[in-house]
């Protein structure tokens, strides 16, 4: 889940 500030790439 990308909150904007924290970028978590889901692959």
Swiss-Prot record:
Keywords: Amidation, Neuropeptide, Secreted. One of its GO terms (biological process) is neuropeptide signaling pathway. InterPro entries: Periviscerokinin (IPR013231). GO terms for cellular component: extracellular region. It is found in: Secreted. It comes from Mastotermes darwiniensis (Giant northern termite). Pfam families: Periviscerokin. This is Periviscerokinin-1. The lineage of its organism: Eukaryota, Metazoa, Ecdysozoa, Arthropoda, Hexapoda. The modification Valine amide is found at residue 11. Belongs to the periviscerokinin family. Mediates visceral muscle contractile activity (myotropic activity). The keyword Secreted applies.
């Amino acid at each position: 889940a990308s909150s904007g500030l924290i970028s978590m790439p889901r692959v």
